[in-house]
Amino acid sequence: MERKQTATQSQKLMVFVLSMSLYGLATLFTELIPSFQVGIVEFSVEYFLFIPLVLAMLFDPMSAALGAATGELVFSEIMLGQFGGLGELEKFITVTIGVYIAGRLVKNPKNRKVVAASAIGGVIIQQFLGTVVDILKVQFAVSDFEAVPGLPESVFATEGFAFLNDVLFSGILFCMLPTLFLVPKLYGKIEPLLGMQPRTEKTALEPINLKVIV
């Protein structure tokens, strides 16, 4: 009977540092990429989330997720003097949840359909949670939110459009497609470098359930 895929503390630390450094540097690079506008639609590179997604699908998902969130916080926010508190905490939590769930959903990294669905699913979860938090922040900040004419509709429309834009543009081009290409290519080749066995359906972590959530 094969054992579940487990990692030692040193291996988890290596995955954490690898995810933090690679994704942190990638977020610095995205700050330099200009956005362009077509009519009322603005296209911009939100993030290169494929980096932690690939690591989460091949290694320990929690280590990769926490590393990515920490890397973005340190490299993109604190080092650039953009740390604002609540917004960064929100991004830290949503990125961790999205990447972790995506990594747990993949049992066989060779299954391209599951890899693609998990990658875009992780992006959707992260973006949806961020959208909900942004809407709630406006509701709590504005007294009598429903009483202001047109405010609820404009907030929902703006946040909803931003959600779709980020998922369809950055989510597909810079998250799902690179992940779909890299995970099968790296599977079985990068794990031995950290002294780990490749993930299989028999050794993968158990599916997400109530016990895991608790």
What spans do the regions from the language model cover?
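Short hydrophobic/aromatic-rich motifs at helix boundaries and adjacent loops
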Residues: 21-28, 70, 154-159
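Short alpha-helical interface elements
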Residues: 46, 54, 65, 78-80, ...
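Interfacial aromatic-anchored transmembrane helix boundaries in multi-pass membrane proteins
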Residues: 27-42, 71-104
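Hydrophobic transmembrane alpha-helices
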Residues: 1-64
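Short helix-perturbing small/polar motifs within transmembrane alpha-helices
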Residues: 2-27, 90-138, 180, 184, ...
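Membrane-embedded alpha-helical hairpins and interfacial helices in multi-pass inner-membrane proteins
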Residues: 35-37, 41-42, 109-214
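Hydrophobic alpha-helical membrane segments of integral membrane proteins
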Residues: 63-71, 86-90, 113-117
